[in-house]
Curated annotation (Swiss-Prot):
Belongs to the universal ribosomal protein uL16 family. NCBIfam families: rplP_bact. It holds the Pfam family Ribosomal_L16. Keywords: Chloroplast, Plastid, Ribonucleoprotein, Ribosomal protein. One of its GO terms (cellular component) is chloroplast. It is found in: Plastid, Chloroplast. GO terms for molecular function: rRNA binding; structural constituent of ribosome. Its main location: plastid. Part of the 50S ribosomal subunit. This is Large ribosomal subunit protein uL16c. One of its GO terms (biological process) is mitochondrial translation. Gene3D superfamilies: Ribosomal protein L10e/L16 (3.90.1170.10).
């Protein structure tokens, strides 16, 4: 199930910049194993959902999964073959802004080998380089 905010204060946003590293959401809080971003990127709600589904399918009802990012930024696209001007395009999809160091998914209640395999499958769905981390 694709996620997006129930309501926002403004319909459209500036694109913004992704400079620096993530100072929030870079520690494992809930689970034992996690997937951590190593590069900055926009991750779409479809990519987040694909990774989550891949992990749950591999774990087969075992363990618990937490998704630590939420797509709260609307990306606008103007219709094809439209002339320039006449305002900004309409919101097309939602993205989560991810900086290096950010934890994307967490997992607990499974063995390390299963967690490593499940998280590596989810990592293949991501548009960035990631690493597998274990809570101390």
């Amino acid at each position: 199930m694709l996620s997006n905010p129930k309501r926002t204060r403004f319909r459209k946003q500036h694109r913004g910049r992704m400079k620096g590293i993530s100072y929030r959401g870079n520690n494992i809080c809930f689970g034992r194993y996690a997937l951590q971003a190593l590069e900055p990127a926009w991750i779409t709600s479809r990519q987040i959902e694909a990774g989550r589904r891949a992990m749950t399918r591999y774990a087969r009802r075992g363990g618990k999964i937490w998704v630590r990012i939420f797509p709260d930024k609307p990306v606008t696209i103007r219709p094809t073959e439209t002339r320039m001007g006449s305002g900004k395009g309409s919101p097309e999809y939602w993205v989560a802004v991810v900086k290096p160091g950010r934890i994307l998914y967490e997992m607990a209640g499974v063995s390390e080998s299963i967690a490593r395999a499940a998280i590596s499958i989810a990592a293949c769905k991501m548009p960035i380089r990631t690493q597998f981390v274990i809570a101390e």
